[in-house]
Amino acid sequence: MASSSLVTSLLFSSSSSSNTATSTSSRRSFSLFSKNQYCKPRPLRRSSSRLLVRCSLQQQQEEKAAPAAESHHAGGGQDDAATASHHAVEGENGVADADGGGVKKSKEELEEEEQQEVDWRSDEEFKRFMGNPSIEAAIKLEKKRADRKLRELDREPDANPLAGLLRGLARGQLAREKERLELAENTFKALDLNKLKSCFGYDTFFAVDVRRFGDGGIFIGNLRKPVEEVRPKLEKKIAEAAGTDVTLWFMEEKNDDITKQVCMVQPKAEIDLQLEITKLSTPWGYLSAVALAVTTFGTIAIMSGFFLKPGATFDDYVSDVLPLFAGFLSILGVSEIATRLTAARYGVKLSPSFLVPSNWTGCLGVMNNYESLLPNKKALFDIPVARAASAYLTSVALAVSAFVSDGSLNGGKNALFVRPEFFYNNPLLSFVQAVIGPYADELGNVLPNAVEGVGVPVDPLAFAGLLGIVVTSLNLLPCGRLEGGRIAQALFGRGAAAVLSFATSVALGAGAIIGGSVLCLAWGLFATFVRGGEEIPAQDEITPLGSERYAWGLVLAVVCLLTLFPNGGGTYSSDFLGAPFFRGGI
């Protein structure tokens, strides 16, 4: 459907287009819902762009004509005579407007509009208009496009029956599209900012300035009471004044090192539409989640076979691998329950959980999308922390209990044997080898804790716990919409989180290029392109998090660094990036 494509394009291009417009006035824009900002918005079709130009030119002409009309009325008879003669000329040389409303346009004006359509890419008025697109304008422009196409079809002669049949089908499709656009036009309307100004006051949010943003606006001022008290009261007043439900965001913007508080107002119908477009809680979404879960269990099964002793039978495979599966399921299950309970406490809807398969570690964690607005920065912080902390605790509990039960000597009767190839060129896994011990010393001699020609024995549950710690740390990297990226956005803001995300992507890329790590390459590509971008802004980004959450963030950052940083006792036999002495050959 043509209308849905343009409306969707404007929804996801509003943030990037508004950045261009507001940067000229030295104001920082707010990219509301561009979840993956590394993806460019889809461009408008040329026919829609032409209509945008016409609408822009008509609006500019009306604005210029308004003061001229007032001066004509004040001028007296001479101005009236000039106006009359002007209309007389229009009556002789004019043609009916495309809308058929009786408004006349001269040939010069039509030629000018046609030239603007040809040169729309370089037209400054068009660029200013596109600086703040809205759904209401898109619907009107698509409706005009449908009307023009219908008139063109009516004027074309029926050269043959086949052409007439095709035109009839096209005419019917355009007529149905026009009806849908008329229904949508009654739903999506731009808010009247002049009416909304009176809703702000000393007892809620004192607004001193306002500017248009999409179909809503950004009110600049200062908050007079806590957000949890102001938001419901202000939403009710604005909804009554606007005649439609609205959604509010309380945020901060920096301009020349001056931080200002702003209240952003948007029609609720448009926000609900965008959340509906991007949600994954659909039959296809659940089917994809099941497919990824099956794939992940398959990669765990394949990866487990690499750690069996030589000559192992199928019974050995079952007895040795089942504990590893149980360990993975325990970590994933506990972290998923903790995440959904925390999200429910804040009233945040989550998408289905998507497992990330890996043929190296079996699983690289779980990813969720937010399918509703976040009420505040506390929710943005607590939800990912709940997943990370619960995964860490479960992994440590499994590893410690398994090491204690087998005496940390031979891995128990169902031991897995971790071969040295597992760690080769993988600095992110050095923590695992530092715990279970290396296979050989610096001279290549097999150490007592290893079995020559096989590997280092380890209990399956302990191995699952160690891998769970590493995978959780990978998800805590401050990149994109990983759990660590969400925490960084809550702690430091969107700008600092974007810088950290870029630095993390560069570091992972360096590990892949310099260190030759396949895991660095795979995780860097996944974090940058699949989970890249920024998370949805919280509705309350003014209320501070508090020192306790900053302390928790510091603790998680230290744990993440210690478990991922290359160490001499792990992957490498010497400090930092020394080459391993054992290269395989089992």
Curated annotation (Swiss-Prot):
The chain crosses the membrane at residues 287-307, 318-338, 389-409, 427-447, 454-474, 506-526, 550-570. Its EC number is 3.4.24.-. GO terms for cellular component: chloroplast membrane. Belongs to the peptidase M50B family. The keyword Magnesium does not apply. It is a multi-pass membrane protein. It comes from the Eukaryota. The gene is EGY3. One of its GO terms (biological process) is proteolysis. This is Probable zinc metalloprotease EGY3, chloroplastic. One of its GO terms (molecular function) is metallopeptidase activity. Residues 103-195 form a coiled coil. PANTHER family: ZINC METALLOPEPTIDASE EGY3, CHLOROPLASTIC-RELATED, ZINC METALLOPROTEASE EGY1. Residues 13-32, 58-122 are annotated as: Disordered. Probable membrane-associated metalloprotease that may be involved in chloroplast development. Residues 61-73 have a biased composition (Basic and acidic residues). It comes from Oryza sativa subsp. japonica (Rice). Keywords: Chloroplast, Coiled coil, Hydrolase, Membrane, Metalloprotease, Plastid, Protease, Transit peptide, Transmembrane, Transmembrane helix. Residues 1-54 form a transit peptide. It is found in: Plastid, Chloroplast membrane. InterPro entries: EGY1-like.
